[in-house]
């Protein structure tokens, strides 16, 4: 059974009387048709003023078969007015207000232009929101991310040139550890710069499953640890990412691979003794 929605298509076989616009309806269009088997029926499309259940729709037009609208607004209206099977009509009631077509790409383009939030598409594009709410939220998040990243500016410090030089030479074993005990050395600003200029993966740490799920095979991985995280650093996930193979068990178990990953850690502390081989860490003092 369909969830409560605004837009409904319907078929009513062997109708006995014409239909009219109910107070709960915003728009109604239908016509009398004859199917291939010769059956006479109403074919129509309804836009409700608010979300309505299937049971609620059947109370409005008893005996009708209802389906949640699958295509676009314009397609549903056109299907209810097609000429090839028409006997009488079509009849329209209420106001048909063309809105953005219910296609995700067009909704995304509209969101990009207007800056609307995903929830604002519930009324205008009810079916797109029903099907793709999470996709729209993700897309809006990407727009916000791009806007934020474009505004990031970097005030260069001497130590940053040392990291730049290291990144010029690929090394499949090292972990670059940028250590600045005082704070205010520009570690986070430089991490943002690498996100902006090199599409780096950024994390402040956490559980292996969460980090593995979020990592999308970026070649440059950044861990920017707050001072308060010193006792909770997940050294294992740092090493797994550097090795270019990590298991993501969140939602769906999958092993992710990469032929090369560069890892940079930004911290106010040095790594705990014994967590890495000494020859694996390359320190840069901020």
Curated annotation (Swiss-Prot):
Motif RCR-1 location, chain numbering: 9-12
Record's keyword annotation contains Transferase: yes
Recorded catalytic activity of this chain's protein: ATP + H2O = ADP + phosphate + H(+)
Main location: host cell
Domain (CRESS-DNA virus Rep endonuclease) ranges: 2-96
Membrane-spanning ranges: none
Descriptive protein name: Master replication protein
Positions of a divalent metal cation binding: 33, 41, 84
Keyword Nuclease among record annotations: yes
Misc. remarks from the entry: The genome of nanoviruses is composed of six to eight segments. In addition, some isolates contain subviral DNAs.
Residues binding ATP: 186-188
Short sequence motif named RCR-2, residue ranges: 41-43
Cited InterPro entries: CRESS_DNA_REP (IPR049912), Helicase_SF3_ssDNA/RNA_vir (IPR000605)
Cellular component terms (Gene Ontology): host cell nucleus
Cited Pfam families: RNA_helicase, Viral_Rep
One of the GO biological process terms: DNA replication
Cofactor mode of binding and number, as noted: Divalent metal cations, possibly Mg(2+) or Mn(2+).
Motif Nuclear localization signal mapped to chain: 50-70, 96-102
Cofactor names: Mg(2+); Mn(2+)
Biological role stated in the UniProt entry: Essential for the replication of all genomic viral ssDNA (trans-replication). The closed circular ssDNA genome is first converted to a superhelical dsDNA. Rep binds a specific hairpin at the genome origin of replication. Introduces an endonucleolytic nick within the conserved sequence 5'-A[GT]TATTAC-3' in the intergenic region of the genome, thereby initiating the rolling circle replication (RCR). Following cleavage, binds covalently to the 5'-phosphate of DNA as a tyrosyl ester. The cleavage gives rise to a free 3'-OH that serves as a primer for the cellular DNA polymerase.
EC number: 2.7.7.-, 3.1.21.-, 3.6.1.-
Keywords from the named record: ATP-binding, Covalent protein-DNA linkage, DNA replication, DNA-binding, Endonuclease, Helicase, Host nucleus, Hydrolase, Metal-binding, Multifunctional enzyme, Nuclease, Nucleotide-binding, Nucleotidyltransferase, Transferase
Homology family: Belongs to the nanoviridea/circoviridae replication-associated protein family.
Gene designation per UniProt: DNA-R
Organism for this UniProt entry: Faba bean necrotic yellows virus (isolate Syrian SV292-88) (FBNYV)
Residues annotated as catalytic: 79
